[in-house]
Swiss-Prot record:
Protein source organism: Thermoanaerobacter pseudethanolicus (strain ATCC 33223 / 39E) (Clostridium thermohydrosulfuricum)
Span of domain tr-type G: 8-282
SMART domains, sorted: EFG_C (SM00838), EFG_IV (SM00889)
PROSITE patterns found in the cross-reference section: G_TR_1 (PS00301), G_TR_2 (PS51722)
Gene3D superfamilies: 3.30.230.10, 3.30.70.240, Elongation Factor G (Translational Gtpase), domain 3, P-loop containing nucleotide triphosphate hydrolases, Translation factors
Gene Ontology CC terms, in alphabetical order: cytoplasm
Biological processes per GO annotation: ribosome disassembly
Functional summary from the UniProt entry: Catalyzes the GTP-dependent ribosomal translocation step during translation elongation. During this step, the ribosome changes from the pre-translocational (PRE) to the post-translocational (POST) state as the newly formed A-site-bound peptidyl-tRNA and P-site-bound deacylated tRNA move to the P and E sites, respectively. Catalyzes the coordinated movement of the two tRNA molecules, the mRNA and conformational changes in the ribosome.
NCBIfam families: EF-G (TIGR00484), PRK12740.1-3 (NF009379), PRK12740.1-5 (NF009381), PRK13351.1-1 (NF009891), small_GTP (TIGR00231)
SUPFAM superfamilies: EF-G C-terminal domain-like, P-loop containing nucleoside triphosphate hydrolases, Ribosomal protein S5 domain 2-like, Translation proteins
Name of this chain's protein: Elongation factor G
Residues noted as binding GTP in the record, renumbered to the chain: 17-24, 81-85, 135-138
Any Pfam family the entry gives: EF-G_D2
Amino acid sequence: MPRDYSLDKVRNIGIMAHIDAGKTTTTERILFYTGKVHKLGEVHEGTATMDWMVQEQERGITITSAATTCYWKGHKINIIDTPGHVDFTVEVERSLRILDGAVAVFSAKEGVEPQSETVWRQADKYHVPRIAYVNKMDIIGADFFNVIKMIKERLGANPVAIQIPIGKEDTFRGIVDLIKMEAIIYEDDLGTVMDETEIPDDLKDLAEEYREKLLEAVSEQDETILEKYLEGEEITEEEIHKALRKGTINGELVPVVCGSSYKNKGIQPMLDAIVRYLPSPLDLPPVKGMALATGEEIERKADDSEPFSALAFKIMADPYVGKLAFFRVYSGTLNAGSYVLNSTKGKKERISRILQMHANHRQEMEAVYTGDIAAAVGLKDTTTGDTLCDENHPILLESMDFPEPVISVAIEPKTKAAQEKMTTALLKLAEEDPTFKTYTDQETGQTIIAGMGELHLEIIVDRLRREFNVDCNVGKPQVAYKETITKPVKIEGKFIRQSGGRGQYGHVWLEMEPAPRGEGYTFENRIVGGVIPKEYIPAVDAGVQEAMQNGVLGGYPVIDVKVALVDGSYHEVDSSDMAFKIAGSIAFKEGMKKANPVLLEPIMKVEVVVPEEYMGDIIGDINARRGRVEGMEARAGAQVIRAFVPLAEMFGYATDLRSKTQGRGTYTMQFHHYEEVPKNIADQILEKK
């Protein structure tokens, strides 16, 4: 099966937005118009609305599918879903990794909100070209020009309006296209009957003013346009499109369009802007990775003839086909039924089927090509962030970093009978979401779930009920404390049982030292001259890691430690993996006691937005919660306070903030780093344990 769309006609985009900007409606409308245009041949006037109802019913698919494919004017568009809530910034990061471009949706009333800033900065980090869509032009308080000002001031971007609205609030009825210099007026509620006419008289001056700004912006991108502009010559539509595309892809400007998704206005021109200005996989630099054999950096060009390489970016449990692994192909092609190497795990996997999701149906694919996004059935060991590649040309693409969970709760099913069902469901959910973990507390035997915030865990519990029919009781949220060491030690570990029969003999010397915060655990083998045979070394490492699950202070996991195996001895007959594993474990536990162990707690990056008159109270409150205020700034009539606060002090903050600001304050927080707990507080925590 040959490729159906050439690579320059493929767009992989995300729709980024704050929760209330209207992302879902916008996505649905895109799918509606693209689906309808794609099926023009068979849709008679009467069935269009019918089709729309089916889509409404199938809406579940469009919203939850990690990637949906649709078509517009000879282009193939893959839309990757990005959530808007701050507990899910990890989801946003992982979708931005595999996108080529994005549409940032803003509400015409609120404009740039704190969460839109977070997402925008993440997109900056991955250099994602984007266009802005100012939605909700029909609501009270809509102000297109104010949003442009906010994009410039708050996001430090260079917004260039390529349209201006005709009317606003309940009189919003169309747009002025500043490139063609004509008006598009919507005649019906479905937004399919459009009238292209002259610009209304009362908007001519404004249109001229914004056309000038547009021409200034594009002339900076292109010498020939600049000369024509200065000479006062006519600049063609084609030249404007070309310069806008160049500026968007190199991140120097952001084309801005407007509309009302709910009222079906402005969607088609936005789709035109997606295919005109956002990049295809060919417009971006080759993807970089590491050659497994040599450890050198290598790259893969976006080309079907290159060896196959792809990144799995989301795992979903599907009621019909089991586990779906969504992946993005960076190079080469892949046929259904073939084998790939999961180079992250070092395992060969067979892809039994390949599916592509459309608005209301899924399509079986015989093959996928460079730039495609699809879902694979049959991958058993693949998890989020893994590289899939051609086994004869292995490459390891840069994986995604996922933060450790910072909050945990005990959970139990309401009926004993549902225990097994709950355990299976939790493991499935943990497979989908790398920032969600589930384990059993060694001391109490309770099942513990851990995640990135209270909302994150609430949603997990809700999914248990909705998708797996398991009702659960949930304990009080607990902070995920960790332990570490603060000074280097050298320690001996012996496990020797030699009293008749088969004995046990394991003997190791370890050097332990603190690692920089956030580095995690490293194990180094410094054995020389075979004092411990090679085959027992991994067992020592495993023993150390097992001991790290429960620290010596309060049984919390141990992080940020460097361990080196430096010496030891073995016995020809009695030594075994088991003996060395136990010796490694004993040595680590003993060493940790001597290495000044300390307790660590998660520190959250908190952003509070409050009216000025409450600022003193709120800062006082943050200090009382052991917080450090990092900075403040004024933002649209309110003050933004940025601070680092221990998670332990943030429980119930939403309620406190509401009462302190009469419901006018809002806040967002996300995990930032781990830090040592002050001694007096650590003592209190460990006493309660």
